[in-house]
Amino acid sequence: MKIKLEVSAARCEALERELTALGIDIDDDAPLVLRERNAYPDILTVRDAATNERVRLPVCDIITAEAFGHDVEVFTSSGRYLALSRLYQLQAELDPERFLRISNSVIVARAHIQRISPALSMKFTLTLSDKRRVDVTRSFYYTFKEYMGI
């Protein structure tokens, strides 16, 4: 049997030893997932957009995740990656204190917001650390204001 572990770093090594001793293989591609309640991963498995190879991406490097149709692209300062899941699934995996959905198609990392500019008709335009601009749509306007404390 193969499982994927999504637990805190403090528990990961001990759990991995115990499960391996029981004959259970730990694999990032396993169909079953053992997840710690209220624990968010430090690393996501994604595909490199250029080579299509699987890459373990540190969550702290993520600037945005954007949905384009059925594809979800994850942007970092070092490049562009393709998520292995839908945007709503990715949102559930990310820490809500560090990431916020700002439209139906964009999740943004709070730490990478450099400038917040008000726009017409209950919108904000965000300038990110990679100099890209993204819009907070009207549907997410009040959630964003509360989250950012403005």
What are the functions of these language-model segments?
Residues 1-150:
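Basic, polyanion-interacting recognition surfaces, primarily
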